[in-house]
């Protein structure tokens, strides 16, 4: 797996991409996507940014069209890679978050829902790109959100959500403090110990290579 250094989202976006070391089943690729969403949310939080939209692009492996049952397994669009090999057309979609956020919970849930909506579970995944669109400073978003809440929100529900987001922000601050002091692998999610996870390996790399 390697970082996609040539990937350049639009100026108001923050994103990352991975090329997996081998073809991943959709369930394992979803795990990697959740790790990426978690890292993206922390990156946004550290930069003082929020986003209101996620964009996902998933590239399939050529092995998805190999084998005797390939024709019965896939009937969608096909494209050709740079080596002239036939591959399923990449999956692509976006998910609106409702309000600007850098919440790990909200971003991970939205990314997972987006993956489930656009990715064909019968195909093998090789590349994953996740982007946070329409990013802007947290303070700027808070001013706009406050005006909207005054007019449209249920007060009790809004207060409960704000309390939960405040707890999340304190947790994100604590995670970043620990990682800055002891390294990114000093504190990781339980999902990153599952088979197929890549975050711990990526945390030990600099510029796409092992540190």
Task: Describe these PLM feature segments.
Residues 1-211:
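Basic, low-complexity intrinsically disordered segments
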